[in-house]
Amino acid sequence: MDQPAWKNPRTALIVDGSDAARQRRIPNLASVDLNLLVELEALLQYRNITHAAQHVGRSQPAMSRALSRLRDMFNDDLLVRGSSGLVPTPQAEHLAQMLPSVLNAIRELVSCSSGLRDLRSKVTMAMPDHQSLVLLPYLLPRLGERVPHVDIVTEPLLDGALRRLEQGEIDFAIGQIGAAPPGYLRRGLYADRFTCLLRHDHPALEQEWSVGTFAALRHASIASDSNEGLGQVYDGLVRFGLPGPIVVSNVLTAAVVVAMTDLVLMIPNRVATRVATMLPLAIVDPPVELKPYEVALIWHQRCHHDLEHRVLRREIAAAARMGRLDVSQDQRARRQNDS
């Protein structure tokens, strides 16, 4: 009586310890040459050794040796000679039904470019409110073209962002991030600096723009999302020794309030440039130079080589570059209008 492949002494074996198959022995994949499955697919398709060899780019003797190894692997003749060529055995016919789905799954598994447009997942990005305003208008259209089924969720950049990255609760964090701690990676996106927003007809714009003028104004500020150094972009106010500002929950609300009052708002230049295109606001440099800072992307090392994660990191960086270009163009246009 013929023995099944797993009883063949030439096949290495392991024991499946599950309750459902406690006594069943299955082949050890470490002893199986999966390339033989590609040759088997061609042999079953063409039922001719010469044609199958040509299909996979092998010589006829090499394909004959592959068939011999396949017969050993499955302990079955697989293909036998008939009056019109090779004829599959019942075992081979059964394999022919299973093989396409198995090989397609393997091809998808190892292909670095397959299925990107078919990715379906939710990606969570933690960033301050103002970074969403700057980045998402450039990022979302790019993702819509390249990975249309990936859903982007943004969250405030709260305390514990590094821990949440490690535990997989969020996928990315974006903000003022210095050197990446051990186990994390960092990519700089762009440099920014503080500028001031005032309503376009503010009386202070008719005066000398000095530290005294600036300090005499009532200030607005945006509530910081984080206390761990990742999202604090408004601490420049402290440099002037000013009294506590009127704190507003988000940047758009603050900008609308500034456009309708005599308040001044000091925010990153990219944000100021964006909101000044939507509201009647003027952008003025602070009367004292403030040190620029870098906005960076950070992620956990466990995701570093993940295909989807790599694609998203690339698209985030590309969106940041697009924003840099637009800001430069807006600044040139504003200087021309002022001249």
Curated annotation (Swiss-Prot):
It holds the Pfam family LysR_substrate. Residues 49-68 bind DNA. InterPro entries: LysR-type_TF, LysR_subst-bd, Tscrpt_reg_HTH_LysR, WH-like_DNA-bd_sf, WH_DNA-bd_sf. Residues 32-89 form the HTH lysR-type domain. Keywords: Activator, DNA-binding, Nodulation, Plasmid, Transcription, Transcription regulation. One of its GO terms (molecular function) is DNA binding. It comes from the Bacteria. Acts in trans to stimulate nod gene expression. Belongs to the LysR transcriptional regulatory family. This is HTH-type transcriptional regulator SyrM 2. It comes from Sinorhizobium fredii (strain NBRC 101917 / NGR234).
